[in-house]
Amino acid sequence: EDVLGNQAPFDFDVSVKDLYSAFKTGATLVLIPRRMFSVVTELLDYLCEHRVTTLIWAVSALCLVAQFRGFTYKVPESVNKVLFSGEQMPAKFLSQWQHYLPKASFVNLYGPTEITCNCTYHVLSRERSYSGGLPIGKPFPNERVFLLDSENREITAPDVPGEICVAGSALALGYYRNPEQNQAHFVQNPLNDRYPETIYRTGDLGKYAESGELFFCGRKDFQIKHMGHRIELE
């Protein structure tokens, strides 16, 4: 039986994945006390004691364990699935997790809050070096992800940056009482002139590799991510 270890507080969108994944599958969900993410030894004790199998964590939480060399204290060997999102995963910390959990699956997730947390995923292969970075993967069911240039033309060629746009059933209705942001981000699909179809313009930039895989490559504005939180530098 799967046991999910909840990392995100309930006012953070990542918690939705823990809650509804557990409800949908009948898995057990354990609520890890917040203070334990400041005391890595206690956190690892908790994961081992509750035999947690699945982690759907922000990258910053995984980095915390690796930075403080937590696995030299204890390895939660019951963990067999690690899914992460929020920002780009540093290769040196990812390799540490993979080294100490050799049988676990690792999944890179991508997506903003506005499309219900995630819209793409990539299951990592242990036989691949990922020297060019981690792809953000392919869309989840009922989602479409594509790139638009500055003139609203779709980009399909490799190595050409464009804005990542999302369509599908998981889009939010919009921002609460913020019509200016709604007009900028929740817009009619410029590729569809046949019927109304709202897309979300993420403000993130992506590009395709020669393999056809999609990679995140920055922002079109001055927003950054730090420890999973959006920060506007303007």
Please state what every model-predicted region is.
Residues 1-5, 13-53, 126:
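Conserved AMP-binding/adenylation subdomain of ANL enzymes
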Residues 8-12, 35, 113, 168:
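Conserved AMP-binding
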Residues 59-60:
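Short secondary-structure boundary segments
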Residues 63, 99-108, 120-234:
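AMP-dependent adenylate-forming
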